[in-house]
Amino acid sequence: MQTYLVGGAVRDYLLGLPVKDRDWVVVGADAQTMLAQGFQPVGKDFPVFLHPETHEEYTLARTERKTAKGYVGFSFHADKDVTLEQDLMRRDLTINAMAQDADGKIIDPFGGQRDLAAGILRHVSPAFAEDPVRILRTARFAARYRFEIAEETIKLMRQMVENGEADALVAERVWQEFAKGLMEKNPRKMIEVLRECGALKVLLPEVNALFGVPQRADYHPEIDSGIHTLMTLQRAADMGLSLPERYAALLHDLGKAKTPSDILPRHHGHDLAGVEPVREVNQRLRAPKHCAELAELVCRWHIIFHQVGQLKSQTILNVLKKTDAFRRPERFQTALNVCIADTQGRLNREHTPYPQRAHWFALLEAANQADSGKIAAECRAQGKAHLIAEQIDRARLAQIAPLQKTFRAAQDKTEKH
C-alpha cells in the first residue's frame, strides 16, 4: 500500500502557491485494507476514505469508463491492481495529473511540469472528451493562471460541443464551475475560452450574442458590446467585487443584443430590453437568489444610476423606492459598485471617476432623515392614516431636492470648464 499526494496540491506546490486542499491516492489497497487501517468511508459513488487523524481524503487508485452522455455517465474500477499511472491517466489536464511520493519525488508521466513552465493547459488523453464538465474546468483554470489552451485541446473541446456533450450538462454543475471561474483573478479569460470552443453559445447564448454588436464610439471606444462586457467583468474582478457583483457585471448589457439593427450603434431602452434575457439566464443556470436579484436590478437600473445628475427629485425618490434601497441599502451599494465597473470597463477609461455613487448614497442618507415613524404616528393621531405614505414621500422629497440642486449645479459648472 503506497500513498501519493495528487492533483491540485502538487500543481500549486510546483507553482509556488499556497496548497489549500490536499488529496491523496492509494495504490495497492482495497476497501478492506483501508477499513483495517482505521479509515472512514465517505464516498457514495467513488472509493473515498477519510484519514483517521488528519481527516484528509484518500481515494483508491481507479480507472473509469464512459457509459452514457454527460458527466454522470461513468463506471469505475478500483482495485489493488490499478497502478498510479492508470489513475493519473483518467485526470483532465497534464498539470493536474502529477503525484508526489513520501520522499518528495514528483511522478509526472504526462509532461505536467513542462506544461506548467510553458503556461499551457493540455488534456492528458482522449478520455478528456468523456466528461463535459472538463470544458468548464479548463476555462476556469485558464482564468486562474492565464494559461493558454493547447491547440489539440481546444480542438477537442470544440468537437465535444459539436457532439452535444455541453448540452448534457446539468444546471447545478454549470453554476458550480461558472461561479468558481467568475471569482478567479481573470474571469474574462474564462468567457473567452468558452467562446473560442463554442460552449458559450450553448451555455450562455445571451452573452454570446453580444459579440459583434456595435456601440457608439464616443461612449465606447472598444465598439463591440461583447468586448465591453468582458472589460466590465474584468474590471469588477480587479476591484475585488463579490460573486453577485461579477455575475451582474457579466449580464448588465444583455439588452444590447436585442437592439433593432436600424438604430445601431445606439441602444435606447437596452436596460429594459435586457431584463427578460437576464431572467432566462437566471432560470437556466439556477443562479442563487442573491445573484439573480442583483443581476436583474443592475440590468434594469444601471442607465438611470449613471444619469442621476439629470433626474428630477421625484424620479430619484421613485428609483430609491423601486430598487428597495430604503430596506436593502447594502444591495443598493453593490449595484452601484457594478456601475463603476461598467463605467471603467471601456477602452482607455479604466480610471474614469464615478461621482454618481457617492451622490446616490448622499441622496439615500438625506431621504432617510425624514422621520417616517414620527410622520406615521402624527397621521394616525389626526385620523389620517391613509395619508402616511404620501406624507413620508413629501418629507423625503424635501430632503432630496436641495441636495440634487447642488449636485446638478456642480455638474453644470464642471461641464462648462
Curated annotation (Swiss-Prot):
- Residues recorded as binding CTP, renumbered to this chain, are G8, R11, R91, R137, R140
Q: Which residues form the HD domain?
A: 225-326
> Quick one: which residues bind Mg(2+)?
D21, D23
CDD domains in alphabetical order: HDc, NT_ClassII-CCAase
Q: Tell me the GO BP annotations in alphabetical order.
A: RNA repair; tRNA 3'-terminal CCA addition
* Key words, A-Z: ATP-binding, Hydrolase, Magnesium, Metal-binding, Multifunctional enzyme, Nickel, Nucleotide-binding, Nucleotidyltransferase, RNA repair, RNA-binding, Transferase, tRNA processing
Q: Which Pfam families match?
A: HD, PolyA_pol, PolyA_pol_RNAbd
The record lists the catalysed reaction(s) as:
a tRNA precursor + 2 CTP + ATP = a tRNA with a 3' CCA end + 3 diphosphate; a tRNA with a 3' CCA end + 2 CTP + ATP = a tRNA with a 3' CCACCA end + 3 diphosphate
**A molecular-function term among this protein's GO annotations:** CCA tRNA nucleotidyltransferase activity
User: Which superkingdom?
Assistant: Bacteria
Cofactor comment text = Magnesium is required for nucleotidyltransferase activity. Nickel for phosphatase activity.
* Listed EC numbers: 2.7.7.72, 3.1.3.-, 3.1.4.-
Q: Gene3D superfamilies, per this entry?
A: Beta Polymerase, domain 2, cca-adding enzyme, domain 2
Query: Could you describe the subunit structure of this protein?
Result: Monomer. Can also form homodimers and oligomers.
So what does this one do? Catalyzes the addition and repair of the essential 3'-terminal CCA sequence in tRNAs without using a nucleic acid template. Adds these three nucleotides in the order of C, C, and A to the tRNA nucleotide-73, using CTP and ATP as substrates and producing inorganic pyrophosphate. tRNA 3'-terminal CCA addition is required both for tRNA processing and repair. Also involved in tRNA surveillance by mediating tandem CCA addition to generate a CCACCA at the 3' terminus of unstable tRNAs. While stable tRNAs receive only 3'-terminal CCA, unstable tRNAs are marked with CCACCA and rapidly degraded.
The cross-references to HAMAP family, in alphabetical order and at most eight, read: CCA_bact_type1, CCA_bact_type2
NCBIfam families given in the database record = PRK10885.1
What the record says about family reads: Belongs to the tRNA nucleotidyltransferase/poly(A) polymerase family. Bacterial CCA-adding enzyme type 1 subfamily.
Q: What else is known?
A: A single active site specifically recognizes both ATP and CTP and is responsible for their addition.
Instruction: Please state what the annotation says regarding this protein's domains.
Output: Comprises two domains: an N-terminal domain containing the nucleotidyltransferase activity and a C-terminal HD domain associated with both phosphodiesterase and phosphatase activities.
Name of this chain's protein: Multifunctional CCA protein
Q: From which organism does this entry originate?
A: Neisseria meningitidis serogroup C / serotype 2a (strain ATCC 700532 / DSM 15464 / FAM18)
